[in-house]
Amino acid sequence: MASLPVLQKESVFQSGAHAYRIPALLYLPGQQSLLAFAEQRASKKDEHAELIVLRRGDYDAPTHQVQWQAQEVVAQARLDGHRSMNPCPLYDAQTGTLFLFFIAIPGQVTEQQQLQTRANVTRLCQVTSTDHGRTWSSPRDLTDAAIGPAYREWSTFAVGPGHCLQLHDRARSLVVPAYAYRKLHPIQRPIPSAFCFLSHDHGRTWARGHFVAQDTLECQVAEVETGEQRVVTLNARSHLRARVQAQSTNDGLDFQESQLVKKLVEPPPQGCQGSVISFPSPRSGPGSPAQWLLYTHPTHSWQRADLGAYLNPRPPAPEAWSEPVLLAKGSCAYSDLQSMGTGPDGSPLFGCLYEANDYEEIVFLMFTLKQAFPAEYLPQ
């Protein structure tokens, strides 16, 4: 299977004096710009994460190219004595506030150490910007207020990674996907379950939603309309050789109908993070969904390789996912997607930031729906 033609493919973060992992991408439509985030690490190891870095990309519509500016450190996104991980950006379109959520972990304490000792030392943090990421606030530790007593019931937790979601409910609620390793048994290994952090007051206060099925880890959420109902669909990494999908009809508080989507394969033994977004359907008419879903993930069933895109034109139906189209051949891992409006061929435009070349670089891809799924795209 050959890789599809794309509008742009460019390396945004490259290993050298530092390694870069865990991409997160945010499109700001009013600015026609992208913010690409990643962890800067001393090496590829998780415990060698240090800071969160950012590159700004300006989309030039006449040339259909993104011009990337120099790399900068989000210096405020850290707690003293901690390393910053899992960048999760979110733009509140109603207030103009840009949030960057992340987790902070002391020194080089690993996830495995927290699972073995059953001692949770991870903190949930945010910084905010009111000038589209040019300057940032001091860090705010949300852990105690957002999690409360349940913190002691977890061995560790994380957010995202990747973009978060603002809903189209009356409150324009903010949703931050997450997962926690819960100590459900006094002796057995803690079990991971996905959930969401929720704010109904533009980030002033935060609540914790209920857990999805067990054995769900890194996840992302998207909002779709099904008839008269808005649904938040959650797509999670699992150890079960396939993705887990679940739906919420109360804005991410509760998730029902957790399903294993066998078409969305997970490479053994631990699976891999993936990205999901909704975007306006190119089809109109009675019975046509208002949004479709796009999902990116390694397509190889045995290893982290061959980045693919999957389309769901009847969301959130798990059986409606397409076969994948190949975005990039070879080694790949984590990715993050953004919808960027309309492309030069009149079909929806997407940006994808993904890990490539055995974690040696993080690459930006830009492509249209018509390039990826020509048979599916019908002009209005």
Swiss-Prot record:
Short name of one Pfam family: BNR_2
UniProt keyword terms in alphabetical order: Carbohydrate metabolism, Cytoplasm, Glycosidase, Hydrolase, Lipid degradation, Lipid metabolism, Repeat
SUPFAM superfamilies named among the record's database cross-references: Sialidases (SSF50939)
EC number(s) per entry: 3.2.1.18
GO biological process: ganglioside catabolic process; glycoprotein catabolic process; glycosphingolipid catabolic process; oligosaccharide catabolic process
Reported impact of D46A: Loss of enzyme activity
Subcellular location: Cytoplasm, Cytosol
Motif window: FRIP motif: 20-23
Catalysis performed (reactions): Hydrolysis of alpha-(2->3)-, alpha-(2->6)-, alpha-(2->8)- glycosidic linkages of terminal sialic acid residues in oligosaccharides, glycoproteins, glycolipids, colominic acid and synthetic substrates; a ganglioside GD1a + H2O = a ganglioside GM1 + N-acetylneuraminate; a ganglioside GM1 + H2O = a ganglioside GA1 + N-acetylneuraminate; a ganglioside GT1b + H2O = a ganglioside GD1b + N-acetylneuraminate
BNR repeat positions: 127-138, 197-208
GO CC annotation: catalytic complex; cytoplasm; cytosol; lysosome; membrane
Functional summary from the UniProt entry: Exo-alpha-sialidase that catalyzes the hydrolytic cleavage of the terminal sialic acid (N-acetylneuraminic acid, Neu5Ac) of a glycan moiety in the catabolism of glycolipids, glycoproteins and oligosacharides. Recognizes sialyl linkage positions of the glycan moiety as well as the supramolecular organization of the sialoglycoconjugate. Displays preference for alpha-(2->3)-sialylated GD1a and GT1B gangliosides over alpha-(2->8)-sialylated GD1b, in both monomeric forms and micelles. Hydrolyzes monomeric GM1 ganglioside, but has no activity toward the miscellar form.
Protein name per Swiss-Prot or TrEMBL: Sialidase-2
Source organism (scientific name): Homo sapiens (Human)
Gene name of the record: NEU2
